[in-house]
Amino acid sequence: MGTVGFILAMWVVDGMGWTASNIQLYFGAAASVVLGIYAFTLPKCEIKKKNSSSLFEALGLDAFVLFKTPKMLVFFLFAILLGAALQITNAFGQEFLVSFNQFDEYKNSFGVLHPGIIMSISQISETLFILTIPFFLKKFGIKKVMLMAMMAWFLRFGLFSVGNPGAGVLLIILSNIVYGMAFDFFTISGSLFVEKETEDKIRSSAQGLFLMMTNGVGIILGGYFSGYVVDFYTQETVRNWSQIWMVFAGYSLVMGILFFFLFKHDHRPEDYNNGTFI
């Protein structure tokens, strides 16, 4: 449901003409206050009491023991690299479309006037691809599914490099559709993989570690890397988006090739029950 809210927010901001306005921030702040007040009306949840644990365990640091396992070490390292890819598209996807307003042939196109609606196709695709994860995980296993995600990132950026809001708008739309696979086939599948590969006592900490690698370390590194690349291909105020997206596409391709050779995992379909992990 969070993704549905994401889509609605993008449509509201776009429809109200707030794309380049700080009004969207005030709107978001007000909505957060209302949601926070509503949260106090929700039923109380019983908290399961656990046996006393050390501060080390309470902080979730016990999950770092997973780095001793080569397979999990490689997995978390690539979680960082994929988190960087996510930051790239989050930071520059919409700016890419808006930048075409400096060209007469594109400035009145739907993609330039309503970039939020065009980019929301990515989240719509995300809600659909998530339904396919049980089938793909059982059929192909985590390694091939994650490789699909990396190749989807390659297509995501590659299609951006040749697309535009005019005659090439279908390529932009296709890139947004591919995003659903790029995001879900790693973020959701990766979470399920962590669920299966970890013991009960550190499972919640392991999920937190996975989130930290993708949305923490990966986002930070992706911000620095993408910022450097974008600045490198910017002359005065004009960005060479084709070259920028090609660099990011190349990054995703190299990442996929390295993952293919470095990540060792034997898929066993019998580990799945009705498409989910036992």
Across the structure, where does each feature detected by a protein language model lie?
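Intracellular juxtamembrane helix-capping segments at the cytosolic ends
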Residues: 1, 185-199
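Short amphipathic helix-loop junctions that connect adjacent transmembrane helices
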Residues: 91-115
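A membrane-interface helix-boundary motif in multi-pass transporters
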Residues: 15-31, 228-252
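Pair of pore-lining "gating" transmembrane helices in MFS-fold secondary transporters
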Residues: 68-89, 177-178
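Multi-pass alpha-helical transporter architecture, strongest
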Residues: 32-44, 216, 244-278
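Helix-to-loop junctions at the C-terminal end of transmembrane segments
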Residues: 13, 17, 128-142, 230-231
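C-terminal ends and interior cores of transmembrane alpha-helices
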Residues: 151-165
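Juxtamembrane intracellular "pre-TM" segments in multi-pass secondary transporters
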Residues: 43-77, 102-103, 107
